[in-house]
Amino acid sequence: EYHMIMEGKKLSQSTCYQYGVTLKYLLSYVRIKHKVADYDISIIDAAFVNEFFAYLQGYLRQDNMKRCDINGALKHMERFKKVMEMAFNNEWINRNPVKALKAHKEKTDINELDEEAVKRLSTVILPPNLGIVRDLLIFAVYTGVSYEDMTRLTQKNIVIGIDKSLWLSYYRQKTDIH
């Protein structure tokens, strides 16, 4: 909570949401493994960190809970590490045990759409609701606009550019760059 009060103003809404998800997983782990609702931050050690990391990937999880792949678990651990670093800097703990975690991201293959696939997609006849989704995807492919930014676009974002043609003008949600 302290981290969100101090850092929340600097973080995007989606990043704040992700910190909340990490907290939810952490509290769930503490309830399941340690049978308590709250846990003293000063007694978090390497074993706690390693078991929480394993928990994120499926250890001790109920069947209906989503398991993280290693890269997703590492993102949660990165947020946990930042919070623990803040606790260390405020002298609430003597060391940050998350720093000792040794894990590496797995390389993921990114499948790119080639021009032929985009053309095929654009000619498929779909029901109206799926047609809109398809059109938005193709728009994103050609403009490079992220999904997050597309959800915030309105007519006001279409402006006359310096070449007198229609341009898209908006602030990027993630970086606040125009």
Stretches found by the model and what they are:
Residues 102, 108-109, 117, 152-178:
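Conserved tyrosine-mediated DNA breakage-rejoining catalytic core shared by Y-recombinases
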Residues 66-70, 74-78, 89, 93-147, ...:
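Basic, Lys/Arg- and aromatic-enriched nucleic-acid-binding interface segment
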Residues 7, 37-40, 64, 109:
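Residues marking the start of alpha-helices
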Residues 35, 62-67, 129, 161-166:
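Short, solvent-exposed loop/turn segments that connect beta-strands within catalytic domains
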Residues 32, 55-58, 62, 89, ...:
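Conserved helix-loop functional segments at active or binding sites
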